[in-house]
Amino acid sequence: MPDARAADEPAQRLPRTGNPATDYALALLAHLIGAGVRDIVVSPGSRSQALALAAAELERAGAVRLHVRLDERVGGFLALGIGRETGAPAAVVTTSGTATANLHPAVLEAHESGVPLIVITADRPPELRGIRSSQTTHQDGLYGVAVRLAKDVPAPSGEEEDVATAARLAVESVRAAVGAETADPGPVHLNLAFREPLSVAVPPLPVVERGALPALAGAQKLGRETVVPGIGPSTVVIAGADAGPEAEEYARSAGFPLLAEVSSGSRFGPNLVVAYRELLREPEFGGRVRRAVVFGHPTLSREVPALLLRDDVETVVVAPRGRQAYNPGRRAVIVGAVRPAVEADPRSPEARAWVGLWVSASRRLVEAAERVASPDATAPDLAKARSLDPSDALAFARMELAAVRAPITRPLLAEALWRHTWPHDRLVLGASRLIRDADRIVPGKRLRVHSNRGLAGIDGTIATAIGVALASQAVAVETGTLPGITRVLLGDLALLHDAGALLGGSGEAWPNVQVIVGNDGGGTIFDGLEVATIASPAAFDRVLYTPQRGDIAALSTAYGWAHRVVRTKGELDQALSAPPAGASVLEVPLER
């Protein structure tokens, strides 16, 4: 922990207004910035006005990026998206009352995903609590075990010690959010009481120093060591959500097949097995596995937990951060890191045969699935294209035209989106049926993929994507690198559930973000569950499939987003290859 006196010094350089709320708010936010915070999200409110006005002046001074959102739930997920992309906590500021509860979904997702986040809620002072004061509820401890640090901060009194206390609290909060001492990053809750007068005008600010983020503590803080699994028995590497490139590197260097989910950040490399679900069900593949090394949080299949529940499969879970680790059988060995055995040789005949068995079988299955999904698709006949015979040229043109006019299916949509996304872009996948379609077919490609798989809810998907877009594109501008586009793939229900995220203030900057919605008229993800076979059609449609009356085109226009409907493969490819142009919605009608 930094020395308290060092934390006090910048506070003395801030202007003093004589208003306790304003002076405290300035000190707290300035020191959050000094500890590594780069983004503040504000929702309007009276009790939090000192924080909001201080944030505006800090943005004017060039110290921070400010984002204003009317809906606190949207603001929470926006901050979550920023934290996902940067690894730095964004601070989200709300007033008291129900505003604080609207942050709870984002807090829970940040908790389960290990995303740093700082929640700052304004509150009444003690004398106004418990007497039915307006817009007052019990906010202390509101988020329970989901936060890494919770502080109920007394109302500042205007004493000199107030700003020093705020400075220390800011440093402590950032360190808790990033897991500097615990290796357990996640949300922090600061509940700040303010007495009237709630603010005064903020004078011009001096230069506010922007500090570096503290480093994440090592896995040894969790008592997890680095282990070296041997070269046998028959081993696979499983990469779930947020596993990152480390899973691919280990699988390749150790000579093991890589079963990587589309949201893992590990879905690339020569050892990748795309059709892992089908192969895990087969005795000659899944039945031969005797050890699994797991990275990240697998959530997209039933076959993976079924494998790890088997008594004859040894499970090693790599969890360098977070108190909880994925452990469906409750008997996995939880470690901080893995290294290939010294004797491991990925080029050995045994390793090549084991990996090759999985990779080649996966390739055959994917090709077969593509033929089923697009039975009319054929490879271009280049001989006809080069032929001088007019009939050959005409036949080739007809084939190409048929391919362009092909209707869009879910696999085709997922494949096209994946193909048109580049490493400098960002891809956000919602908790809809489409993420599973993508997981079944898209090939290896090193992309930055985000998905809220901590709790896998459909809420907040668009807001998260906008946060990812704002953060990634701001960093690109600052570093002089090529800014990409952020695309989010989701279903119609997920879009309608987060429709408020499409709303932005007239003074807010909007990034290049494209929302691609597969509109199949409801929750078709339930069609593949057991409930579809036992419920009556009428009851199933009403309470699970839940078709909505929403008009996505009208909704997009009302909120100022460009909207386009695409129905064919050619239209889809054209829309995805067009240069980024602000905020847009691409609606793709799909059959149920």
UniProtKB/Swiss-Prot annotation:
It is an enzyme of class 2 (transferase). Binds 1 thiamine pyrophosphate per subunit. SUPFAM superfamilies: Thiamin diphosphate-binding fold (THDP-binding). Pathway: Quinol/quinone metabolism; 1,4-dihydroxy-2-naphthoate biosynthesis; 1,4-dihydroxy-2-naphthoate from chorismate: step 2/7; Quinol/quinone metabolism; menaquinone biosynthesis. GO terms for biological process: menaquinone biosynthetic process. One of its GO terms (molecular function) is manganese ion binding. Keywords: Magnesium, Manganese, Menaquinone biosynthesis, Metal-binding, Thiamine pyrophosphate, Transferase. It catalyses: isochorismate + 2-oxoglutarate + H(+) = 5-enolpyruvoyl-6-hydroxy-2-succinyl-cyclohex-3-ene-1-carboxylate + CO2. Disulfide bonds: none annotated. Homodimer. NCBIfam families: menD. This is 2-succinyl-5-enolpyruvyl-6-hydroxy-3-cyclohexene-1-carboxylate synthase.
